[in-house]
Every structure is written in C-alpha cells, then in structure tokens.
C-alpha cells in the first residue's frame, strides 16, 4: 500500500510539473507529504533559493526558479533539513547545525556553505532528484 501511495503521489507531482506553468506551492506540498513530513510551505523574497526554519517547521521558497530541476533540488534540500530536525528534535538540530557552522568558520570556511548539514542536504537532493524527474 505504501508503494501505491508513493506512486500516486509521484504521478500527481509529475502531472503538476508537466503543466505549462508549475504550481510550486502544490508541488512542494506534495513532495513534503511524500517524505512523511508536515512542514509548512511559504514563499519569500531574497536571493536564497530556499530556507528551512526549524522553529516553525517551515520551508520558504522563491516564487520562481530558472528550471524545474532548480526547484526540485531546492525543495529536496530543504526537506532533508526538515527530516533531520524531525529525527533529532528541533532544539538538538538547531544546536548541531549551529555548532557545525561555528566549526566551519573557526577553520576559516563559510559557516553556511561549508556546514556539514548543508553538504548532507545537497547530497540528499542530488540522490533523490532522479525519483522526481
């Protein structure tokens, strides 16, 4: 039954993606559900592709992306953060994420780009992308 649910969710996502203009909100909500999460989705402004806010379990996305691939990579990346926060608990996730950023900065690296949690989320997104494209 689990596979049937995933397949029907997959078909719905693919149908949405094939529309002339992708409904990012609906597609993101469907993806979040496929990973067993209840994270909220909202649109924001700014230069970031996306952001996960663990305190409110919210994924913030841009209103548009250069390609469907960029959109999917962003949503999947943020889903990984949400999965980690769910697995560890919000407070523990925030603590570990912040510590990793501090350690990167201490080593003269970027606290965001060189944060091991960001690297894990990017690997997860690349690994999962083929399921949705």
Task: Please tell me what each predicted stretch does.
Residues 76-84:
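Short active-site segment of divalent metal-dependent hydrolases/proteases
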Residues 69, 73, 85-119:
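Post-HEXXH active-site segment of zinc metalloproteases
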Residues 116-129:
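An active-site-proximal "capping" alpha-helix that borders the catalytic cofactor pocket
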Residues 34, 40-69:
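Catalytic zinc-binding patch centered on the HExxH motif and its immediate surroundings
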Residues 1-41, 91:
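Intrinsically disordered, compositionally biased, charge-dense segments
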Residues 33, 50-51, 101-106:
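Short secondary-structure boundary/capping segments within folded domains
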Residues 20, 127, 131-133:
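Charged phosphate-binding loop/patch that engages nucleotide di/tri-phosphates or the phosphate backbone
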């Amino acid at each position: 039954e689990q596979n049937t649910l995933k397949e029907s969710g997959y078909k719905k996502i693919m149908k949405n993606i094939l529309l002339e203009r992708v409904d990012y909100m609906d597609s993101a909500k469907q993806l979040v559900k496929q990973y067993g999460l209840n994270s909220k989705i909202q649109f924001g402004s700014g230069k970031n592709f996306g952001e996960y806010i663990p305190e409110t379990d919210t994924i913030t996305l841009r209103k548009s992306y250069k390609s469907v691939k960029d959109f999917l990579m962003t949503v999947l990346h943020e889903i990984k953060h949400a999965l980690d926060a769910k697995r560890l608990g919000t407070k523990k996730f925030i603590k570990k994420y912040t510590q990793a950023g501090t350690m990167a900065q201490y080593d003269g690296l970027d606290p965001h780009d060189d944060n091991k949690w960001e690297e894990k989320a990017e690997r997860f997104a690349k690994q999962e992308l083929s399921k949705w494209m």
